[in-house]
């Protein structure tokens, strides 16, 4: 018996351009996820992408309007490419309208250089922009009238009102600088493309940074985004590799079966639960799952199977 584990679901805000995109599925999936007991629904963020890709904060606002209690979150918002004061207003509004359900996941991306060019932000500035932005964002959320005269932000007397409910900030990343930033500035970590051993090592580095920042006694969430293919057949792993882990072909993942077994969830419900337990054993407290197969009908079949065969054991802590 383990403690109950929270599990969220990535909304179908993106998918291959050769498929017909059904925008209505974002709202209906959010409603369904709330009804079956997912802890949160999440949306990814890109402004230039090879696939269909709906904007994250707009999609989450739509999902919030269709639900009442489920958490809503960005996994992850590319804050460094956006104007900070606008993001503060957008996210504070969303947190208020959703009665405090927003979890703000933030990352620096970089896998699609064209979108940074389109945003007018040099790739090399991503980390520095985030380091400057986060303390300012916290102060605005707290109701302060903020003055800034930094390298990337220059404004005076900027505040958000009404003051929003608390907005937990989760940061993504696994590079050394990212882990240091997470320990210093975040309420939680959203890991991705990492093995259980890697998750444990990164968690230890984050804790060391939290210790240095005097934050070790504060609440801290350890989350992980995992792509899954729930399939009992022997061909499941091969199929998942053929689908490129659930990412566009343009993203060169050098995917092979051995790599996939380490970094994704593939197989029967028991296989997936056993793998999830390995992450729980090294400190993971919340999962965000996303089907590898993004074709709309397949996506729906996959999340329904996950909700029926995997989610109940996570929620009740009865994996072992």
Segments (PLM) and residue ranges:
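Glycine-rich, proline-tolerant flexible connector loops at the mouths of alpha/beta enzymes
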Residues: 40-66, 78, 110, 193-197, ...
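Alpha-helix-loop-beta-strand connector modules within alpha/beta enzyme cores
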Residues: 54-74, 129-136, 303-320
